[in-house]
Swiss-Prot record:
Keywords: 4Fe-4S, Cytoplasm, Iron, Iron-sulfur, Metal-binding, S-adenosyl-L-methionine, Transferase, tRNA processing. This is tRNA-2-methylthio-N(6)-dimethylallyladenosine synthase. Binds 2 [4Fe-4S] clusters. One cluster is coordinated with 3 cysteines and an exchangeable S-adenosyl-L-methionine. [4Fe-4S] cluster 2 binds at C157, C161, C164. The lineage of its organism: Bacteria, Pseudomonadati, Pseudomonadota, Gammaproteobacteria, Pseudomonadales. GO terms for cellular component: cytosol. It is an enzyme of class 2 (transferase). It comes from the Bacteria. It comes from Stutzerimonas stutzeri (strain A1501) (Pseudomonas stutzeri). Catalyzes the methylthiolation of N6-(dimethylallyl)adenosine (i(6)A), leading to the formation of 2-methylthio-N6-(dimethylallyl)adenosine (ms(2)i(6)A) at position 37 in tRNAs that read codons beginning with uridine. Belongs to the methylthiotransferase family. MiaB subfamily. Gene3D superfamilies: Methylthiotransferase, N-terminal domain, tm_1862 like domain. The gene is miaB. Residues 143-370 form the Radical SAM core domain. It is found in: Cytoplasm. [4Fe-4S] cluster 1 binds at C12, C49, C83.
Length: 437
């Protein structure tokens, strides 16, 4: 009888990618099939994220809901992976002794043998080491599930921003060999993928054997069948003139960039150890917009970082106006255990943080909607991905400006194809269009 695998994923696109590779790995090595129902699973995996507040509590709360399943089925294997697993290690079992396997982002390739060992020896298996880039050599070819795919090109981060746990949970930066990345994308393209998103915690810091991220972008663009290239997440320090020129030269690169700045106050940026000023950030954006005038920019913002004053927040709002950010992942600051910022006095009242966050997000939402309204009446090329989630009589796809477009059509053969649509209306979170081709 085929064994069943259930995976719950918290957090970023890197975690989504890692979870998809776990499915590939366990499907190949243990013939497991994915299920959406944890009650019928033989193996349950929780892929965790530790970026935001109360991440650990969220993990243990979820594990508690699965405890009864373990009691009913002692053969069930429960595993915890991701960044909380890296932080907590074997200590996870202090609060959840029914967990069988604990693994980090860099050791997910060892899951088959860890699961087997947990079953046969009835002893917990813990491996949260950082074995460089070994996991990519041990993973099977990725499954193709639709016209878009994620491709991890590097792992970890060496920037050590004072608020961030990534260097401690995913290790320092390690890039995959260029040939390996390209081989994976060729495989995807040969199996119908038309759009790839290159992933890394500091993706534009990619470097391997004399090749940098701009070289990688040009090489990916040369692969037959790849019509669109996205990438995330970038660091302003690594956003070089060569990358800007690549945006001007490579038609497959979308006109949308996620380049987190976190704050607009130089004093706060220094306290965060971002190693650039607001002016330096704006200078990079100006050069990019000179090369690609209609590109849209999104960011991350942390509101209420220790010591943030009203003046600091005003400077952040000025940066938002100056750049015209289209979208943001914005959060109230919360200390992450083990980071340098956790030792700073968190002296901004919670209510003030929430007020600032609301003001910031409202303005960015306004700017994003204004950008959407400017698209009304234009023709946009979209990659059709699926039926609309709200109306089965409509298809949907995404523009190169990262807008979801829903349009009336019931022809499933268009899924996976590029089509032109006329934009008829702008809604708060999507566009409405009419098929032209």
């Amino acid at each position: 009888m085929t064994r069943k695998l259930f995976i719950e994923t918290h957090g970023c696109q890197m975690n989504e990618y890692d979870s998809s590779r776990m499915v590939d790995l366990l499907g190949e090595h243990q013939a497991m099939e994915i299920t959406e129902n944890p009650a019928e699973a033989d193996v349950i995996l929780l892929n965790t994220c530790s970026i935001r507040e109360k991440a650990q509590e969220k993990v243990f709360s979820q594990l508690g809901r699965w405890r009864e399943l373990k009691q009913d089925n002692p053969q069930l294997v429960i595993g915890v992976g991701g960044c909380v697993a890296s932080q907590e290690g074997a200590a996870i079992r202090d609060r959840a002794p029914y967990v069988d396997v604990v693994f980090g982002p860099q050791t997910l390739h060892r899951l088959p043998e860890m699961i087997d060992a947990a079953r046969t020896t009835r002893t917990p298996q813990v491996d949260i080491s950082f074995p460089e880039i070994e996991k990519f050599d041990r993973l099977p070819e990725p499954r193709v599930d639709g016209p878009s795919a994620y491709v991890s090109v590097m792992e970890g981060c060496s920037k050590y921003c004072t608020f961030c746990v990534v260097p401690y949970t995913r290790g320092e930066e390690v890039s995959r060999p260029l040939a390996d990345v390209l081989a994976e994308i060729v495989h995807l393209a040969e199996n119908g993928v038309k759009e790839v998103t290159l992933l890394g915690q500091n993706v534009n810091g990619y470097r391997h054997d004399g090749h940098d991220f701009a070289d990688l972008l040009h090489a990916v663009a040369a692969i037959d069948g790849i019509g669109r290239i996205r990438y995330t997440t970038s660091h302003p320090l690594e956003f070089s003139d060569a990358i800007i020129q690549a945006h001007a030269d490579i038609p497959q690169l979308v006109k949308y960039l996620h380049l987190p700045v976190q704050a607009g106050s130089d004093r706060i940026l220094a306290a965060m150890k971002r190693n650039h000023t607001a002016l330096e950030y704006k200078s990079r954006i100006r050069r990019l917009k000179a090369a690609v005038p209609d590109i849209l920019i999104s960011s991350d913002f942390i509101v209420g970082f220790p010591g943030e004053t009203d003046k600091d927040f005003e400077q952040t709002m000025k940066l938002i106006e100056d750049v015209g950010f289209d979208f943001s992942y914005s959060f109230v600051y919360s200390a992450r255990p083990g980071t340098p910022a956790a030792d700073l006095a968190d002296d901004t009242p919670e209510e003030v943080k929430k007020q600032r966050l609301a003001i910031l997000q409202q303005r960015i939402n306004q700017q994003g909607f204004e950008n959407s309204r400017r698209m009304v009446g234009t023709t946009q090329r979209i990659l059709v991905s699926d039926y609309s989630k709200k109306d089965p009589g409509m298809l949907q796809g995404r523009t190169e400006h990262n807008r979801i477009v829903n349009f009336r059509c019931d022809n499933p053969r268009l899924i996976g194809q590029f089509v032109d649509v006329h934009i008829d209306d702008a809604l708060p979170h999507s566009l409405r269009g009419s098929l032209l081709s």
